[in-house]
Amino acid sequence: MQCFSFIKTIMILFNLLIFLCGAALLAVGIWVSIDGASFLKIFGPLSSSAMQFVNVGYFLIAAGAVVFALGFLGCYGAQTESKCALMTFFFILLLIFIAEVAAAVVALVYTTMAEHFLTLLVVPAIKKDYGSQKDFTQVWNTTMTELKCCGFTNYTDFEDSPYVRENNAFPPFCCNNVTNTVNETCTKEKADNQKVEGCFQQLLYDIRTNAVTVGGVAAGIGGLELAAMIVSMYLYCNLQ
């Protein structure tokens, strides 16, 4: 009985933390969606390069909602000793775990397919908004500065973009691989000669370089999810 009470308390405290994290993610996601400019101004230089490729606001809202609901279910199920809530918590966490494993396998096996899919989404956005949408342009400038890359695939992503039409030149990042002369006009010939790597390939390189760290974090998250599933099932099986 004492063991049951101890595990129940741990379950409540753990899920309370998850609940608060979900609420924080939701709050930040809503803030980014409503006032993205101020978010980028404060956190842009410090933000993860990987997050630059997605709409951060919607991503955080979706992730926050799932984490928030999961934390609430875990707390409620453990506190009220509700078998229904605990079983729902278990199955949602199991689905998330399976989805994460599947996503990891797909990412490892179908990297080329993922690149093609993302290219179809990202490149048209660059051609449409780079140079005309301030926040979008700032995000890409930060990404290209941090990763020392050019565009999603290469400099051709910027052809016909508002920036190229207005300046009759490509972003300086596309000509900054060798000479480091940012102030020089980046013509198509210079960009073609210097062949600065696209940001997707550069990001993959950085991830592979830090594979141990990435793998450790992923394993840690997976371990916590497995532990939470085991605890929830233990509580479920020991309830009257």
Curated annotation (Swiss-Prot):
Subcellular location field: Lysosome membrane
GO cellular component: cell junction; lysosomal membrane; nucleoplasm; perinuclear region of cytoplasm; plasma membrane; vesicle
Source organism, top-level taxon: Eukaryota
Keyword Transmembrane helix: yes
Topology with respect to the bilayer: Multi-pass membrane protein
Topological domains, Cytoplasmic: 1-9, 74-88, 232-240
Gene3D superfamilies given in the database record: Tetraspanin (1.10.1450.10)
Glycoprotein in keyword set: yes
Residues in the Extracellular compartment per record: 31-52, 110-210
Any matching Pfam family: Tetraspanin
Family: Belongs to the tetraspanin (TM4SF) family.
Entry function: Structural component of specialized membrane microdomains known as tetraspanin-enriched microdomains (TERMs), which act as platforms for receptor clustering and signaling. Participates thereby in diverse biological functions such as cell signal transduction, adhesion, migration and protein trafficking. Regulates neuronal differentiation in response to NGF by facilitating NGF-mediated activation of NTRK1/TRKA receptor tyrosine kinase and subsequent downstream signaling pathways. Plays a role in the inhibition of TNFalpha-induced apoptosis.
Name of the protein in its database record: Tetraspanin-1
